[in-house]
Curated annotation (Swiss-Prot):
Gene3D superfamilies: alpha/beta hydrolase. It comes from Xenopus laevis (African clawed frog). Residues 364-375 have a biased composition (Polar residues). This is Protein NDRG3. Residues 348-363 have a biased composition (Low complexity). SUPFAM superfamilies: alpha/beta-Hydrolases. The lineage of its organism: Eukaryota, Metazoa, Chordata, Craniata, Vertebrata. GO terms for cellular component: cytoplasm. The gene is ndrg3. Belongs to the NDRG family. It comes from the Eukaryota. Disulfide bonds: none annotated. GO terms for biological process: signal transduction.
């Protein structure tokens, strides 16, 4: 078996190094909507114009965040402009999580995670959106996955960061309940967003998000959202059995790009999700030297990966191929799934220089793989 060789990436744009990343939370130009659904009101920010039959990029944030703190530094990054000039963007804020949201009345029943997914149908209908490419983080990745399972014709692709497809077990559920009694919700959320190493070393970044969660997010509403996420059901997705005459209806039908940082607390959950998805439509991207917020810490690399992913779907054919040095990786298992470097797969080299015409997007569509980004 050949030794795995790490993918190297030439960094042209600097990573987010500002001591106050919160300055990047400012919103870009967009039209805000409060959309009534049968399950409550959804706050939506729409940017750009829809283009014929082209899908819209639809984002959904994680617990403790809203669309501004989760995605604005990413979508304001220069490299993302090459993508957003081709697509309209629709940012979803989970109920009560937008900046300045009032508290829900006493006794309010917050939507379940499945109901949050149902609410997206009304959003698409209201905005006359025909299909989406979803970009979700954590809880938002779960919501978009559930939506894709229920509405496969409306979802052309998914970029899922830090997804956990599993329901919490009784022990984990009890531990999360206990943590609310012994720890404030801000610290609970920080433990979800950041790995132990980040909490100890990335003090400026963690403090920025600590202040944001404590000051910009309604604490009562946040606790309801966290409880909803912790009470989620298992997605019950199953990897298709190749050669079987009975197709499974419990798998995501569209192409999926799974993303996780190697220091993220969600690594094991993302690998578990990868093992359940169709390997012919799924790519697992693990970022080295990155924790729980790849879109904040490594925006250039994530933007490049999304560009290749979207090109593999047949969009943006003329966009430039600039930075990645690629390594074509093949599955070491008979099922075709890829594992993260803790369980090394074998690799054959195929370098992509900036002058090369070869596209990683073709590789993404051809075979399941793990791409390890190093900086």
């Amino acid at each position: 078996m050949e030794e795995l060789q790490d993918v190297q990436l030439t960094e042209i744009k600097p990573l987010l190094t500002d001591k106050d990343p919160g300055q990047h939370f400012e919103d870009f130009d967009g039209q805000e909507h409060d959309i009534e659904t049968a399950l409550g009101v959804v706050h939506v920010t729409m940017s750009g114009n829809t283009r014929g039959n082209r899908p819209v990029l639809l984002t959904y944030h994680d617990i403790g965040l809203n669309h501004k703190s989760c995605f604005n530094s990413f979508f304001n990054f220069d490299d993302m402009h090459e993508i957003t000039q081709h697509f309209a963007v629709c940012h979803i804020d989970a109920p009560g999580q937008q900046q300045g949201a009032p508290s829900f009345p006493t006794g309010y029943q917050y939507p379940t995670m499945d109901e949050l997914a149902e609410m997206l149908t009304a959003v698409l209908t209201h905005l006359n959106l025909r299909s989406i490419i979803g970009i979700g983080v954590g809880a938002g990745a779960y919501v978009l996955s559930r939506f894709a399972l229920n509405n496969p014709l409306l979802v052309e692709g998914l970029v899922l960061l830090n997804i956990d497809p599993c329901a919490k077990g009784w022990i984990d559920w009890a531990a999360s309940k206990l943590s609310f009694w012994t720890t404030n919700v801000v610290e609970v959320v920080l433990g979800h967003l950041f790995g132990y190493e980040e909490l100890q070393s990335s003090l400026d970044l963690v403090q920025t998000f600590r202040l944001h969660i404590a000051q910009d997010i309604n604490q009562d509403n946040l606790e309801l959202f966290v409880n909803s996420y912790n009470s989620r059901k298992d997605l019950e997705i199953e990897r298709p059995v190749f050669g079987s005459s009975t197709p499974t209806n419990t798998t995501i039908k569209c192409p999926v790009l799974l993303v996780v940082g190697d220091n993220s607390p969600a690594v094991d959950a993302v690998v578990e999700c990868n093992s359940r998805l169709d390997p012919t439509r799924t790519t697992l991207l693990k970022m080295a030297d990155c924790g729980g917020l790849p879109q904040v810490v490594q925006p250039g690399k994530l933007a490049e990966a999304i560009k290749y992913f979207v090109q593999g779907m047949g969009y943006m054919p003329s966009a430039s191929m600039t930075r990645l040095v690629r390594s074509r990786t093949h599955s070491a298992s008979s099922s075709g799934s890829m594992e993260i470097p803790r369980s090394r797969s074998h690799t054959s080299n195929a370098q992509l220089k900036s002058s090369s015409n070869n596209s990683l997007s073709n590789q993404i569509q051809e075979t399941p793989q793990t791409i390890e980004l190093s900086c």
